[in-house]
Amino acid sequence: VDSLYFTMLNANKRSLTLNLKTDDGKRLFKQLVAESDVLVENFSPGALDRMGLGYDTLKEINSGLIYATIKGFGTFGPYSEFKSFEPIAQAMGGAMSVTGFPDGPPTYVWPSIGDSGTGMHLAIGILAALQQRHGDGLGQHVEVSMQDAVVNLCRVSLRDHQRAGHAMPRQGNQLGRNVPGTTYPCHPGGTNDYVYIFAQPQMWSAFLEVIGLPELAEDDRFATLEARWDNREALDAIVAAWTSQRDKHEVMRAMGEAGVPCGACQDTGEVL
């Protein structure tokens, strides 16, 4: 019986199993390669080469083959022989360092940015290689490391590092220095009864109308974006007092209809 993980990722796909440690398995594999456009592999570093099935061997069988490889840390560098999994890629790619709250440890991100993110980057590389093959008829070896994929997905934090000259701290749910720009509790106070509100400066007046406090536009504490940042604890408390009296979907509708970006924090059951 196939695992749930296997069926989730391989629905509507045909598959077969080959033992590549046997002569028959290698022979059948090479027959498939001869008729294939793309080979995707994520074996441990050097595994296919040790079996005699590396790129240099297979391109002699099929010169148009796109040989696509995923490795934890790529072919070169001090960690090229090291194995990797999702959390390792997140740790080494910088994602964990900017995830979590300032007073807590680096935090693992549950959406699989290391696994799925690397696969998406590789798919783009494969498509580019196929496009080039239309011109010269030749395949190529395309490689993406899990660390590199996570680094690319952390590009905003890397940009901010370059601008500030130091590593970016963890900010919890606060997005940059925009206030309001975080999660707020909602009624009835369940585990996921929260909304995320991101009211940009041009939306400030509309936001105040929604929460019924237009007079805050005249409050010096909140008159500018910089002032709102300096007084964010006071403003967040005001917003939370309003959201906590309302269902998260009610808050989302009210904000959305006023042109203020807002999302209800849905659990997996609500998403499905």
Q: Model-derived features: where do they sit?
A:
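N-terminal helix-loop segment corresponding to the beta1-alpha1 unit
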Residues: 1-138, 170
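Active-site-adjacent capping/gating segments
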Residues: 1-7, 177-178, 270-272
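A short glycine-threonine-serine/GTX helix/turn-capping micro-motif
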Residues: 107-117, 139-141, 172-175, 179-181, ...
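Beta-strand segments within the central parallel beta-sheet cores of soluble alpha/beta enzyme folds
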Residues: 139-147, 254
